[in-house]
Amino acid sequence: MPDTTGGHPAALKVVTLDGPAGVGKTTLARRVADALGIPYLDTGAMFRTMAWRLGPDGPDLDEALLRDRLAGFVFTLRGRGGASVLSCNGEDIGNEIRTEEVGAMASRIAALPVVRECLKAAQQRMGAAQPLVVEGRDMGTVVFPGARHKFFLDAAPEIRAMRRYTQLQTMGEAHDLALLTEQIRSRDEQDRNRAVAPLRPAADAIIVDTGDLDIDGVFGVIMQHIRSRDGL
C-alpha cells in the first residue's frame, strides 16, 4: 500500500475537515469538493456502515473474529464533488445509517484500534489514488497528516444539537432537543478522550468556529484559505 501518512505527494492533494458532530462538516465538504472539482469522502459514513452491518454486538466481538468480518468490507468511491457516491461491497450507502442509534454504535466501534486500522488503510488508498475532500474526526492528525489543507470546525454543543434536531425533523424523525444535547456532550467526551485517535485539531489546522457563521460564511473562510495558499 502506498505511504500516504507523511510526505507522499498524494497526501498534499487532500483537504481535511475534522470536527465533532453537528458542525456542518458534511455540507461543507460537499460544497468544497464541488468548488474544487474533486471527489468527496465522508469517513463517518464508513464507520456508520460498519456499525450498521456488524450490529449492536459488533464492538463486543472477539478481535480475531472482528478482524475477519472487517476484511469483508470493501469501500469504493465514484463521482466528483458533492455528487460523489460511497459504496460498500457494491451497494451504495444510503440514509439507513443516519439514525441516532447507528451513530451511537459507530462511536463505540470507532474506539476499537482494529476498526480504525482497517478504515485508515481504506481511506489512505483512496487518497493515494486521487485528490480528495475528506471529512471526519482524525483526518488531519492520523489518516492524512501530510494533507496540504487542514481545517477543524467547532461549535458549542447547544448549537450543534439544534442543528441536528432540525436535520432530523427534515428526515421525519422526532427527537427531544435536551436529550440530543446530552447525547452530543457524551459523544464529545467519548471522542475526545478515547485512547486511539482522539478528536483534536492538527497542530497546523485552521480552526473555524461555526457557531457565529452560517454555512456560506464558513465555506467562504475555507475557500479563502485554500485559494490564498494555492495562489488561485
Swiss-Prot record:
GO molecular function term, any single one: CMP kinase activity
Gene3D superfamilies cross-referenced by the UniProt entry: P-loop containing nucleotide triphosphate hydrolases (3.40.50.300)
Entry GO CC: cytosol
Binding positions (ATP): G19, P20, A21, G22, V23, G24, K25, T26, T27
InterPro entries: Cytidylate_kin, Cytidylate_kinase_dom, P-loop_NTPase
Listed SUPFAM superfamilies: P-loop containing nucleoside triphosphate hydrolases (SSF52540)
Organism domain of life: Bacteria
Catalytic activity: CMP + ATP = CDP + ADP; dCMP + ATP = dCDP + ADP
Subcellular localization, as worded in the UniProt entry: Cytoplasm
E.C. number(s) listed in UniProt: 2.7.4.25
GO term, biological process aspect, one: nucleobase-containing small molecule interconversion
Residues of the signal peptide: none
Pfam families per record: Cytidylate_kin (PF02224)
Keywords of this entry: ATP-binding, Cytoplasm, Kinase, Nucleotide-binding, Transferase
NCBIfam families: cmk
HAMAP family, per database record: Cytidyl_kinase_type1
UniProt similarity note: Belongs to the cytidylate kinase family. Type 1 subfamily.
Protein name: Cytidylate kinase
